[in-house]
Amino acid sequence: MSSAQSIPLSDSAFIPLVKMPPKTDNKFFLLGYYIKQHWLSYSIGILAVLATNWIAVSIPEYVRLSIDLLNDGLQTSQDLLWEYLLIMLGLALIMIIVRTSSRMFFFNPGRAIECQIKNDMFKKLMALQKNYYEKNPSGNIISRINNDITGVRMICGFGLMQAFNITTALSMTPYKMWQLSPNLTLYCIIPIILVFTVVRLGMRVLVQNMRARMESLQRLSGFTVSSLSAIDLIKSKTMREWSTRRFEKENQDMLRRSMKIAWTRSFVMPMLSNLEHFLKILVLLIGGMMVIQEDFTIGQLTAFIAYSALLTFPLMGLGWVTTMFQQGLVGLTSIQTVLQQDLPRAKLLPLSEPKCEKLFAENGLSVKNLNYRYPDGNKDVLRKINFTIRPGQIIGVLGRIGSGKSTLVNALNRYLDINPGSIFLGEQDLALLSDNDLRTSIRTVTQEPFLFSDTVENNVTFADTEYDSIDPEHFREILSAAALEAEVARFPKKEKTMVGEKGIMLSGGQKQRISLARAMLKPCDLLILDNVLSAVDYETERHLLREIYKLLKPENNRPAQAKSILIVSHRVTSMGQADWILVLDEGQIVDQGRHTELIKRAGYYQQMWELQNDHNS
């Protein structure tokens, strides 16, 4: 083993940079993690719900007293009647206040939890490795963020409020009914038990259909996003008919599953709503007979009817709340699959010391016997890769498509979860560096540039928190170095011109050059260029290469923009000024040396040199 050793760290050293929900397979524990952060608001809301229901069951008692008072027909009871009426009016006004308060103290935390889960989801998605996105389409992820989190918000807001409301109402109201007439209360409970036995069976079917619909919605969202992203390809290949048929198929599947949910609800909900009418008929029939037999007063019967009416909303709401909880819990399970994803160990490290720039200045970057196999692969795509990049060097990597160039770049950037002991920055194992330090030291321009729907200026200065302090003259120099100054000057609003979604208003070469200008804006230790010149002509390529090589030299009292450069390409013309060139084939270094040596040695490099020279001539 070389002197470059990985620094041993205990498991306790691996702490999250950002506080995330605890890892658990129990979705109720995860839900509780968010709810308990708003315990004070929920506690006040629960008290408000209790007060609301206490007032609701108190008013019928005064109605009973008032009716019985009227039934007695005594003139002396007029003052007492007015007292009862004023009490009922006061209770009604108080109930309006506490009921409104209960909604505020439940709904506000629900919205806050929705926001927090979205933030946690986004943080987690930003930290996950590239292979996660290869398995999960963006449309699927968008569906989880939009639809599934909405279901969780409904649980934490309206759902919890109604759960406490229903529990309290179904406790207080039957108690008051029992006080009036135990026998009549038992008659009312029997149909309730029968109805809810049937409803419970319907809810099981409802949950299964909701889970299936959510999966169907994710597939539909994924296909829609993919189709819109590839709209130019679909139009150019006359694939609109195929795309439309595929969308209709997914949409019909979504409709079929939604109809199953509607059918189940149409069976469950009417049973709950018709229960109210059945209870009223039952109370009038049996209670009326009790009044005739003088076992019950008219006031008591009126109060009992009022109590049975108070049972109506909780009983109907129980079906809605059960549906809401089932749908929300299905969404929470989907969210949990993202939040519980394992992070690479390096992403859990605190910031490393010493800083990366010092590490690179000492010994550069070294790759030692690097092997890599994709998680679902059956063979290594990189095998026994060894090389070193010293400060001030230009290293070239050349190879045909599928030779492992991009995988190597992703490994150097740690977009892939590499094994410790394979890549070192100075004396430090790259696998144990924090992302913050690594991205400061190593900057990459990819072969597939991504531009935001923003201005040219904001795309170049993306993620640069110190942009306001950048000299405008330096910004223009960067545009010139990226061969963009003349073209940007012709844009309608110069650098303030909007580039459209994913840079749709620009050519492929312009996109790559904006991405290159973004990397040139601030100094770094190692600048990696992954096939960034593939969409430009040879004349522009020569200009860009000259400007790229200038990044290694201090200029106008400014430090060098990069200490070393790694150029990855399939063009031999990009390798002419490199200090050392690696030739990759099938994941292995099959040849290496200087440009002047490789063009004289039989092999892939010489073949590509002759082929590209003939093409250019």
Please report, for each region that a protein language model flagged, where it lies by residue.
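Membrane-integrated ABC transporters
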Residues: 1-56, 71-87, 102-106, 110, ...
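Juxtamembrane loop-to-helix connectors within ABC transporter transmembrane domains
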Residues: 17, 23, 106-110, 126-171, ...
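Transmembrane helices of ABC transporter permease
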Residues: 37, 41-54, 58, 91, ...
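Alpha-helical segments in transporter systems
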Residues: 40-65, 84, 88, 103-107, ...
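Hydrophobic alpha-helical segments in the permease module
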Residues: 87-99, 192-196, 200, 265-279, ...
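An intracellular "coupling" helix at the cytosolic face of ABC transporter transmembrane type-1 domains
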Residues: 130-131, 147-156, 160, 164, ...
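Cytosolic ends of transmembrane helices, especially the final helix of ABC transmembrane type-1 domains
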Residues: 216, 239, 263, 311-340
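ABC-type nucleotide-binding domain
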Residues: 356-617
